[in-house]
Design a protein with these regions (language model features):
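Thiamine diphosphate
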Residues: 1-111, 125-131, 198, 269-270, ...
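Short catalytic-loop micro-motif centered on adjacent basic/acidic residues
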Residues: 25-26, 55-57, 116-119, 187-188
């Protein structure tokens, strides 16, 4: 029947509200039951001729990791709806160690052909993705469902850059343009690590005379699927004009090395390598989770702003654009322990 009482925080801007026209099922620690309820609502369009729009919100580690077979079932029977992986990312649900810290839900999501998965950072990205999902599932009646990660960090959400909707849906758009230094770089980030990438771009500009464009990768998986589709077309149409993948169109004309950083295993962003012609470096969170602050975890997994800067400078040195002494200086300046154990081996 919905919310029949006035909550304690009703006087605040972000107060808790349940609309009587909707339905909220609070199942507690019951992933299998919750996913089954979501599947039931997500298939109501075919079983009862009623279009329902279910959102299942959960800690991201407790989705595909716990109920992967039910997720595969959802794809098989063409369920429609949204799975929202909350507090997503290896370094984000930070207080409870390896059990809760998700570094691979987006990789698992990509195993289901009709699951579209996204890792947004800003509210406008989430809004565009949900709007597009509603259009595809309920206006176009496509047999797909969505997995979208969500965070709970406090940070400023900017206005949506003009003309970015298409890139948000396709999986990549330029968020910020770099300055006018001769040495260039392209920094790709997603989810909670995008903000570290933005900070790294400012540091590169100010401290190392490197101008970096910042790209928000809302969906590496969608970029990969489109890239493979283009490759397949070109392979089977040898005499036709060659198509170019969207990621190639974004990156081919850009100068400098490309560095991608996410809160997930390196395998996630590594998928883009076939379509990036520049020197390409990937940072990720391989290994088990740890119990610590988000800031310290991002340092531990080597995906924070300082490691993004060092990775960029190292790639520039590898291609001969700058000297290795510059990389060594940055490592010393940021107090990075170059002899620390690889996180995946700890």
């Amino acid at each position: 029947s919905g919310q029949m009482y006035e909550p304690e925080d009703s006087g605040k801007v972000m107060w808790y509200r349940e609309d009587t026209k909707g339905q909220i099922l609070e199942e507690g620690i019951n992933e299998a039951g919750s996913m089954s309820e979501w599947v039931s609502a997500a298939t109501a369009y075919s079983n009862y001729n009623v279009n329902m729009v279910p959102f299942y919100i959960y800690y991201s580690m407790f989705g595909f990791q716990r109920v992967g077979d039910l997720c595969w079932l959802a794809g098989d029977i063409q369920a429609k709806g949204f799975l929202i992986g909350g507090t997503a990312g290896r370094t984000t649900l930070n207080g409870e160690g390896l059990q809760h810290q998700d570094g691979h839900s987006l990789i698992l999501a990509n195993t289901i052909p009709n699951c579209l998965s996204y890792d947004p950072t800003y509210a406008y990205e989430m809004a565009v993705i949900v709007h597009e999902g509603m259009r595809r599932m309920y206006e176009n009646q496509e047999g797909v469902f969505y997995y979208i990660t969500a965070m709970n960090e406090n940070y400023t959400h900017p206005a949506m850059p003009e003309g970015s909707e298409e890139g948000i849906i396709k999986g990549l758009y330029k968020l910020k343009s770099g300055g006018k230094h001769k040495v260039k770089a392209q920094l790709i980030g997603s989810g909670t690590i995008l903000r570290e990438v933005e900070a790294a771009a400012e540091m590169l500009e100010k401290d190392w005379n490197v101008s970096a464009n910042v790209w928000s990768a809302t969906s590496v998986n969608e970029l990969v699927r489109e890239g493979m589709d283009v490759d397949r077309y070109n392979r089977l149409h040898p005499t036709a004009e060659k198509k170019r993948s969207y990621i190639s169109q974004c990156m081919d004309e850009q100068d400098g090395v490309v560095v991608a950083s996410t809160d997930y295993m390196r395998l996630y962003a590594e998928q883009l390598r076939p379509w990036i012609k520049q020197r390409y470096v990937v940072l990720g969170t391989d290994g088990f989770g740890r119990s610590d602050t988000r800031e310290r975890l991002r340092s531990f997994f080597e995906v924070d702003r300082y490691h993004v800067v060092v990775a960029t400078l190292s790639a520039l040195a590898d291609e001969g654009t700058i000297k290795y002494d510059v990389v060594a200086k940055a490592i010393k300046q940021y107090k990075i322990d170059a002899d620390a154990t690889n996180p995946v081996k700890v």
